[in-house]
A protein has these predicted regions:
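Catalytic helix-loop patch of NAD(P)-dependent Rossmann-fold dehydrogenases
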Residues: 95, 132-169
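Conserved C-terminal active-site "lid" loop/helix of NAD(P)H-dependent oxidoreductases
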Residues: 213, 221-237, 251-279
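Conserved Rossmann-fold NAD(P)-dependent oxidoreductase catalytic core, especially the SDR/UDP-sugar
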Residues: 103-142
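Alpha-helical substrate-binding/gating segment
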Residues: 174-180, 190-211, 219
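N-terminal Rossmann NAD(P)H-binding glycine-rich loop of SDR-like oxidoreductase domains
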Residues: 15-34
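Low-acidity, Ser/Thr- and Arg-rich intrinsically disordered low-complexity segments
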Residues: 289, 293-324
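Glycine-rich NAD(P)-binding loop of the Rossmann-fold in SDR/ketoreductase-type enzymes
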Residues: 63, 92-103, 111, 141, ...
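NAD(P)H-binding glycine-rich loop region in Rossmannoid oxidoreductase-like domains
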Residues: 55, 60-96
Length: 324
């Protein structure tokens, strides 16, 4: 089946958001709401806070092409957030992050949706070293994980669906998007909820963007890791700064006296996901041996990794909502 995407008309009245029950989807919903706009929220998981005014809920998996295509009918844009948001098995990454993303793009094409905004990640280029900061928007892929590989593949799909089928496709390489920065590294990489809303709104409304790759980060005092040139070209102007959280975060950091240039999570864009012992650490964390790992370790980076895993377990993994 072949459908030709319609051109940009300046109005974004119906937006499909996949993975809408997840962390970023939950933060975006109130920030993208408009009186003349419908948010069509698609997720395999229920919405914990219910369906609000101007919202529709579609319970479906992003791996179900028929359901996805039906959900995309009549929409002006798709925001594709669904997928596993961290490092798991290759099989899960392949099914949910790669096949699920293909399904989202193909469903948009079949339904005639003119624009797809994809939530990519800094982990697509995680092994980009500090010496290259600020990282240009179109930096060559250097994934740090299977998860990062899935984002590289998805960015390739975005390029294909623009060049072959004419869709406007924008990939946002999100760095650290939580309600508050969770750790010292995030003082440099945080994308605030309000700035996330501003960035996605700019991507929704910019006329004829074509295929773009942009970074998602706030105006952090300790930033400068990545370029915001392409994001600003779309109309994004960040307003928030993680520095307001710096005092409390650094007070709790046992390595606060280590300068940034020597602090291992700041040596590569992928942070801790570039550490050589990542596989072993993830295995320990997922196997219920975190306490043993913590007690047996005196190194700062293992403690930091434990904190990161706690954060993901508590608030990040629930957005892995495209499991069929």
């Amino acid at each position: 089946m072949t459908s030709v995407a319609v051109g940009y008309c300046g109005l974004v009245s119906i937006i499909v958001i996949t993975g809408a029950a997840g962390v970023i989807g939950t933060m975006l919903r109130p920030r993208l709401a408009r009186p003349d706009r419908t948010l069509r929220l698609l997720d395999i998981a229920p919405l914990t806070d219910g369906v609000g005014a101007g919202e529709e809920y579609v319970q479906a998996s992003t791996t179900d092409l028929a359901a996805m295509t039906a959900a995309c009918e009549g929409a002006d844009a798709v925001i594709h957030l669904a997928g596993v948001p961290g490092e798991v098995s290759w099989e899960a990454i392949l099914e949910l992050n790669i096949h699920g993303t293909y399904t989202a793009f193909e469903a948009a094409r079949r339904a005639g949706v003119p624009r797809v905004i994809f939530a990519s990640s800094n982990h697509a280029i995680g092994f980009t070293p500090r010496s290259r900061f600020p990282v240009p928007d179109y930096t060559f892929p250097a994934p740090d994980t299977y998860y990062g590989v899935s984002k590289v593949v998805a960015e390739g799909l975005a390029g294909l669906y623009h060049h072959r089928y004419g869709l406007d496709t924008i990939c946002i390489r999100i760095l650290t998007c939580f309600p508050e920065p969770p750790d010292r590294r995030a003082l440099s990489t945080w994308l605030s909820p309000d700035d996330a809303g501003r960035l996605f709104e700019a991507c929704l409304t910019a006329p004829s963007p074509g295929f773009r790759v942009v970074f998602g980060v706030s105006a952090n005092t300790r930033g400068g890791f990545v370029s915001l040139e392409e994001a600003r070209a779309l109309g994004y102007e960040p307003q928030d700064d993680a520095e307001v959280y710096a005092a409390s975060i650094l007070a709790a950091d046992p390595d606060r006296d280590v300068p940034d240039e020597d602090y291992p999570p700041l040596q590569y864009l992928g942070g801790r996901f570039t550490f050589p012992d990542l596989d072993a650490l993830l295995s320990l964390a997922s196997g219920g041996s975190v306490a043993q790992w913590w007690l047996s370790s005196s190194s700062w980076w293992m403690r930091s990794r434990h904190t990161a895993m706690q954060t993901m377990s508590a608030s990040f993994w629930p957005c892995a909502t495209s499991t069929p």
